[in-house]
């Protein structure tokens, strides 16, 4: 948050990534930001869901955002891998690295390299091993009982410059 004044935060997702989980992340971040703000600080949260039904819709939306006359937000929170990679490329293309803080999603090579180079601040990644375990548990439950009605909450990890190496394959290290 800025020391004084308003900090604008934009959550950016695509129609294919807009899920209950993205709504949960949005509400948790909003709650956390509201609890951390001090006197004289305010937070302006916006959420955009890009219609990604056609090829390059996400790329076009992100490009339009960077070339429009409207000011860019202080922080962009990307809610899927495609948005993260599009925003990374736009930051470089439009010379905005350092002007906009970006929190990416997932850990592709592009995202990890962008974190290492300081293009984006960090990324959020779901614990894939845990997803696999829970999937097997749900499948076992379905086979045994004919249904599975549990909700499995999966851990999220924050990837920063300090730990990108942990998310690379052996060949990439």
Each model region followed by its residue ranges:
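Hydrophobic alpha-helical segments within soluble ligand-binding/sensing domains
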Residues: 1-10, 24, 28-31, 55-59, ...
């Amino acid at each position: 948050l800025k020391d004084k004044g308003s900090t604008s935060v934009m959550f950016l997702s695509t129609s294919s990534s807009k899920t209950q989980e993205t709504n949960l992340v949005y509400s948790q971040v909003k709650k956390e930001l509201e609890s951390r703000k001090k006197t004289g600080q305010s937070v302006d949260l916006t959420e955009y869901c890009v219609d990604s039904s056609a090829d390059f819709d996400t790329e076009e939306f992100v490009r339009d955002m960077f070339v429009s006359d409207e000011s860019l937000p202080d922080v962009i929170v990307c809610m899927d891998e495609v948005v993260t990679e599009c925003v990374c490329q736009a930051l470089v293309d439009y010379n905005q690295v350092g002007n906009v803080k970006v929190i990416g999603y997932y850990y592709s090579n592009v995202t990890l390299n962008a974190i290492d180079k300081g293009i984006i601040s960090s990324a959020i990644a779901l614990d894939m091993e845990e997803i696999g375990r829970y999937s097997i548990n749900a499948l076992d439950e379905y086979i045994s009982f004919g249904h599975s009605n549990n909700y499995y909450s999966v851990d999220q990890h924050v990837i920063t410059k300090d730990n990108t190496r942990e998310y690379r394959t052996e060949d990439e290290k």
